[in-house]
Swiss-Prot record:
Annotated active site: E21
Family the entry assigns: Belongs to the glycosyl hydrolase 18 family. Chitinase class II subfamily.
Name of the protein: Beta-hexosaminidase
Lineage: Eukaryota, Metazoa, Cnidaria, Anthozoa, Hexacorallia
Organism: Palythoa caribaeorum (White encrusting zoanthid coral)
Main function: Preferentially hydrolyzes pNP-GlcNAc, hydrolyzes pNP-GalNAc to a lesser extent.
Length: 32
């Protein structure tokens, strides 16, 4: 989601990084 505590650009990059980390964790769990 978007964070009102950050500039829009940083919030967007943060969301992308967060989504990537969550996706990696998800696949890591499936790989077990």
């Amino acid at each position: 989601g978007k964070s009102s505590s950050r500039p829009l650009g940083d919030a967007t990059l943060g969301d992308l990084d967060f989504d990537i980390e969550v996706t990696q964790d998800y696949w890591d769990d499936l790989a077990r």
